[in-house]
Amino acid sequence: MKASETLIVIGREFGSGGRALGRELSKRLSVPFYDKELLHQAAKQFGISLPEFERNDERKPSVLRSMVESAFGMCPANSSNVNSDTLYALQSCVIEKLARQGGAVFVGRTADYVLRNNPRLLSIFVHCDEEGRARRIVKRGDCKTQEEALDMARRNDRLRQSYYNFYTGRQWGNAANYHLCIDLGKLGLQTAVDIVLHATFDLAQRIK
């Protein structure tokens, strides 16, 4: 297998730099990068308004509902009232479809779980100390102060954790659920990129 055929999936704490790592890996391997682009692709493919996906992006349903049977065939075009479970199923369908097209970098959206049985998967969780996360959040203009940034980071982490745990039955951020866990604040972006690339090339050599 070629390294460029690897499916790199990045889970991340809010503000940890996981998206920046994903973009850099995408460039170095010359493979597509999918983050919020997944929502656009899913909305376009299934004829559902983009705001529906954005409202439910990495957010657990407010009430427990069982997955909709035959979800891919039951979604009315341009629906304004599609439930979270159906949207999750459709998004997962898009992730699987994109994975069949070749190597890629996916950020979030439980893609590590969706692709868990794919031998080309390399799953990563990125974390960082709170001070570093706050600095990054302020620098990119999401907040004006570090206090606001920390509040935003913690709030978004809670949302991501509940979403991931709800749909996967796994524990978000638990090292046992990932192939690599990286402290981006300690290692820095370039070192992290080198580590992941090394793992990617090693995985490619071992898969016939």
Model regions: which residues?
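Pre-Walker A (Motif I) flank of P-loop NTPase domains
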Residues: A3-I8, R12, G102
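Small-molecule kinase domains that catalyze NTP-dependent phosphoryl transfer to phosphate-bearing small molecules
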Residues: V63-V68, K144-Q190
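C-terminal helical "lid" subdomain and adjoining coupling/linker elements of P-loop NTPases
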Residues: A204-K208
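Short beta-strand-centered segment that lines the nucleotide-binding/catalytic pocket of NTP-utilizing
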Residues: P32-A43
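ATP-dependent NMP and nucleoside kinases share a basic, alpha-helical "lid"
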Residues: S92-G141
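Short, amphipathic alpha-helical "lid/cap" segments that border enzyme active or binding sites
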Residues: S92, L189-L197
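Glycine-rich phosphate-binding P-loop
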Residues: I10-S26
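ATP-dependent small-molecule kinase phosphotransfer cores
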Residues: A43-G103
